[in-house]
């Protein structure tokens, strides 16, 4: 079709699936450049490494896994005299994530726009253990420019919402967007795909309603079932053979 690999985004849910797709395409084409074949989070890392200046973060920000988060929590516990009897690190991670996503819509604007000094002040003023952890987490994050997995999506969406030039750049770059396992997509991932295909309007999705496995973390099967009602002029193909 005359489209370069770098103008195609193919998103799946696991690094293993993405690696398998890259291997298959390389075997078919012999081309080392297989385009953007990645998970949602990996794609967001790519966006942020290119455009993190829009949120005053360095290109070499840290991607935090659970062990990194636990190390940050340990600092907060020690600084504020908290104990694991009150709340384990695992429970603290869950509490913070729940409040970030459900109860504190101002969390991300604050993390992005407030100074380190202001975040520190909010942390030191907190008294209840939950509030200490919830205010100490963004302060500790910003000190090391660290982002956890959910932050990657939120920061990317924030940049696209706030900066029309950056949004248009990525929309124009990605001529074709393909999403695997669409039955497991959640609200943030769906919004990201809507934004990215807002220029070329070429969106291809693959899904099986009976195979959804991520409803426990926010996946909404309605995005697949209602696809032909939301997207103008779609074409639906039934895949009857397993490849």
Give the predicted meaning of each segment.
Residues 19-22, 26, 74, 138, ...:
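Class I S-adenosyl-L-methionine
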Residues 22-24, 49, 74, 190-191, ...:
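Short amphipathic alpha-helical segments
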Residues 32-35, 53-150, 236-242:
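ATP-hydrolysis module of ASCE/P-loop NTPase motor domains
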Residues 14, 39, 73, 148, ...:
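Residue-level signature of catalytic and energy-coupling elements of molecular machines
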Residues 1-57, 63, 144, 168, ...:
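P-loop NTPase Walker
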Residues 43, 78, 229-231:
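ATPase/helicase motor core of nucleic-acid motors
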Residues 9, 36, 65-68, 123-226, ...:
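Conserved helicase NTPase motor core
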């Amino acid at each position: 079709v005359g489209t370069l690999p770098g103008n195609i985004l193919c998103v799946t849910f696991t690094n293993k699936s993405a690696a398998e797709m890259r291997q298959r395409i390389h075997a078919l084409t012999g081309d080392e450049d297989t385009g953007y074949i990645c998970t949602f989070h990996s794609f967001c890392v790519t966006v942020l490494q290119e455009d993190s200046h829009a949120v005053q973060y360095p290109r070499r920000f840290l991607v935090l896994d659970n062990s990194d988060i636990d190390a940050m929590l340990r600092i907060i516990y020690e600084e504020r005299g908290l104990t694991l009897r009150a709340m384990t690190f695992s429970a603290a991670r869950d509490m913070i994530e729940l409040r970030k996503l459900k109860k504190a819509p101002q969390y991300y604007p604050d993390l992005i726009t407030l100074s380190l000094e202001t975040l520190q002040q909010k942390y030191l003023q907190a008294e209840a253990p939950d509030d200490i952890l919830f205010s100490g987490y963004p302060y500790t994050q910003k000190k090391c420019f660290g982002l956890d997995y959910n932050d990657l999506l939120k920061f990317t969406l924030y940049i696209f919402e706030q900066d029309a030039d950056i949004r248009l750049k990525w929309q124009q770059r990605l001529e074709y967007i393909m999403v695997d396992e669409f039955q497991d997509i959640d609200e943030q991932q769906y919004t990201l795909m809507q934004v990215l295909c807002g220029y070329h309007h070429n969106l291809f999705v693959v899904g099986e309603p009976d195979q959804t496995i991520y409803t426990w973390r926010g996946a909404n099967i309605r995005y697949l079932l209602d696809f032909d009602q939301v997207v103008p002029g779609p074409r639906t193909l039934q895949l009857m053979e397993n490849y």
